[in-house]
UniProtKB/Swiss-Prot annotation:
PANTHER family per UniProt: ATP-DEPENDENT ZINC METALLOPROTEASE YME1L1 (PTHR23076:SF97), METALLOPROTEASE M41 FTSH (PTHR23076)
Protein name: ATP-dependent zinc metalloprotease FtsH
PROSITE patterns according to UniProt: AAA
Organism: Zymomonas mobilis subsp. mobilis (strain NCIMB 11163 / B70)
GO biological process, one term: protein catabolic process
Function: Acts as a processive, ATP-dependent zinc metallopeptidase for both cytoplasmic and membrane proteins. Plays a role in the quality control of integral membrane proteins.
Enzyme Commission no: 3.4.24.-
Gene3D superfamilies found in the cross-reference section: 1.10.8.60, 3.30.720.210, P-loop containing nucleotide triphosphate hydrolases, Peptidase M41
Length: 662
């Protein structure tokens, strides 16, 4: 018995406090259930049939008369349209009473006891209760519950819409530390200083330093901005609130501003603390934007956020972290010191950064002895941290699919090709003619890149459909490129036209098709940028002539006018055409002079389907290629009516590692 009491006492001591919001909802349900029960009892109490025997049997009127004639009826109660009573065996009955003037005489002749009931009338109290009091009590009760719920939510909107959706993260929830972050050392050091300030404020305050009120993480997608915030949550040792910029604005007016107020009220109660707003551009966009009324719900939310961050009331001990990949669309008032004191740039990693990132992601991956991490890092310029993590994951999945116990270098190469060029689509079956046309197209791109100085080295060329392309030529820079000169841009212009010109030289002028549309788009965009943005036209000089391409929602394009005259626009078009025709002429000259090499490379692609840069050079030189396993060729017609004309993947911007051609 003592043991049982001790066990129960221990359980009582170990109970965690219940959620007050759950208790409030339980109380609301109990009150509502009580109101419904009271209404049911009241209706039952005032029901005129409440005292009737529930074991009553309904009988036909003819059977009732037979029972009367046979002395089988004990007593009868005559109502307005119903007869009820008891048979001689004390069983109750009821029946519908027609207008029968001889009924009373028949009952008297058989000595049946009977009585008559007055016509049913509804009392005043029943009318008052059912038609006025009960609905009034119901509405008053619902209104009372609604007001109570509004008060509990702090007046922040209907049924809690105004409550902040910021999530308080604990140290155990997805704990990430700065040790899990690599490749972005400068950004990490900037944020480590904030964590050090929270842990030891006197170290900085004794020299007059103040803790930064906010830090904005800026960088391309996938570079680790959110991961840095998670690391701060794991290292800071203070409450960490996380929310997305899209969580503020709802369809109800005033909800966003109310959520901002509620979020900062929670933060003040938990100060010192950190608030992290992911994708802040969803709420912090430039005010006065768009074609309609600028004073929309989003702007009210932004105004409240500005006031809370650095307004009349100081928020001591609250640090705001935010992340965005669109700093150009943010409101200037949001970016000023006092709100975001620091803008931490999170760039794509260089080769050393990629090496460290790969090492972090490979910790839990069993690697084969032939895996060279530095080679993988060198072959992935322009990759973000998310891209590198995806490569490691894809390589592990490929090895598991093949039944291997270790992930080899071949899986990493295949995973890199999949991430960069798309997955192989071997189910797309091409005819021999379509495959040959694709081979000459890709061979044209590859040959131009090998013979024109300024092109990135040829990494791989394939006629296997990948992604949305039926063939891909992949040129990979030898190192990270921070800028690109005019020689390289003109070489890329020639590279864009290598595929179509190769098809023309082999199949004639009638071979023009839609497959080079993406190549033409890339060349046109590059040439126009050279003329209007980069000042690479001698005739137009070092001026910016870019047309107004700002988005309407930024509020700029509506108020700006074109500062280019018609004559200048004509000159721009002429200069763009000159650059494009120059690239086309260079590509045609190279392919015409090396037509034999074009045939050899195309035949090698038809035979082997995929060639690396070195293997392509050996094929051009007429040397034997022995390192590739020959794949069987299929000449079944292309299914689904798809075109056999190769198309290249979308261009990913200058200076980045993007597949060229097809």
């Amino acid at each position: 018995m003592k043991g049982l009491i001790y066990y129960m006492a221990m359980n009582d001591n170990n109970k965690t406090p219940q959620d007050p919001q759950a208790n409030n909802w339980m109380k609301t349900l109990l009150i509502g259930g009580g109101i419904i029960a009271a209404m049911t009892l009241a209706v039952t109490f005032f029901d005129g049939n409440g005292g009737r025997d529930h074991n009553t049997t309904s009988v036909a009127y003819s059977e009732f008369l037979n029972r009367v004639d046979n002395n089988g009826v004990k007593d009868v109660t005559i109502g307005h349209d119903e007869l009820s009573g008891h048979f001689t065996d004390n069983s109750a009955f009821k029946t519908v009473a027609p207008s029968d003037p001889l009924l009373v005489q028949r009952l008297q002749s058989k000595n049946v006891t009977f009585r008559a009931l007055p016509e049913d009338t509804v009392s005043f109290w029943q009318i008052l209760l059912s038609q006025f009091l009960l609905p009034f009590i119901l509405f008053v009760g619902l209104g009372f519950l609604f007001v109570r719920q509004m008060q509990k939510n702090g007046g922040g909107g209907a049924m809690g819409f105004g409550k902040s959706r910021a999530r308080l993260l604990t140290e155990k929830q997805g704990r990430v530390t700065f040790k899990d972050i690599a490749g972005i050392e400068e950004a990490r050091e900037e944020l480590e200083e904030i964590v050090d300030f929270l842990k030891d404020p006197t170290r900085f305050s004794r020299l007059g330093g103040k803790i930064p009120k906010g830090a904005l993480l800026v960088g391309p997608p996938g570079t680790g901005k959110t991961l840095l915030a998670r690391a701060i949550a794991g290292e800071a040792g203070v409450p960490f609130f996380s929310i997305s910029g899209s969580d503020f604005v709802e369809m109800f007016v005033g909800v966003g501003a109310s959520r901002v107020r509620d979020m900062f009220e929670q933060a003040k109660k938990n100060a010192p603390c950190i608030i992290f707003i992911d994708e802040i551009d969803a709420v912090g966009r430039h005010r006065g934007a768009g074609l309609g009324n600028g004073n929309d719900e989003r702007e009210q939310t932004l105004n409240q956020l500005l006031v809370e961050m650095d307004g009349f009331e100081a928020n001591e001990g609250i640090i705001i972290l935010a992340a965005t990949n669109r700093p150009d669309v943010l409101d200037p008032a949001l970016l000023r010191p006092g709100r975001f004191d620091r803008q931490v740039i999170v760039p794509r990693p260089d080769i050393e950064g990629r090496l460290k990132i790969l090492q972090v992601h490979m910790k839990k991956t069993p690697l084969a002895p032939d895996v060279d991490v530095r080679t993988i890092a060198r072959g992935t310029p322009g990759f973000s941290g998310a891209d590198l993590a995806n490569i490691v994951n894809e390589a592990a999945l490929l090895a598991a699919r093949k039944g291997k116990r270790l992930v080899a270098m071949s899986e990493f190469e295949e995973a890199k090709d999949k991430v960069m060029m798309g997955a192989e689509r071997r189910s797309v079956i091409m005819t021999e003619e379509e495959k040959r046309s694709t081979a000459y197209h890709e061979a044209g791109h590859a040959l131009v890149s090998l013979h024109i100085p300024g092109c990135d080295p040829l990494h791989k060329v394939t006629v296997i459909p990948r992604g949305r392309a039926l063939g891909v030529t992949w040129n990979l820079p030898e190192r990270d490129q921070l800028s690109i000169n005019i020689k390289q841009m003109k070489a890329r212009l020639a590279l864009c036209f290598g595929g179509r010109i190769a098809e023309q030289l082999v199949y004639g002028e009638d071979s023009l098709n839609t497959g080079a549309s993406n190549d033409i788009q890339q060349a046109t965009d590059m040439a126009r940028a050279m003329v209007t943005e980069y000042g690479m036209s001698p005739k137009l000089g070092w001026l910016r002539y870019r047309e107004n391409q700002d988005e309407v929602f930024l509020g700029h394009s509506v108020s700006r006018s074109q500062n280019i005259s018609e004559d200048t626009a004509k000159i721009i078009d002429q200069e763009v055409r000159v650059l494009v025709e120059e690239g086309e002429s260079r590509a045609r000259q190279v392919l015409t002079e090396h037509i034999d090499e074009l045939h050899r490379l195309a035949n090698a692609l038809i035979e082997y389907e995929t060639l690396s840069g070195e293997e392509a050079k050996r094929a051009i030189a007429g040397e034997k290629i022995t390192t590739i396993e020959v794949k069987p060729q299929v000449t079944i017609p292309l299914s689904g009516g798809a075109s056999g004309v190769p198309k290249s993947p979308p261009f990913n911007g200058w200076g980045n590692a993007a597949p060229q051609g097809a």
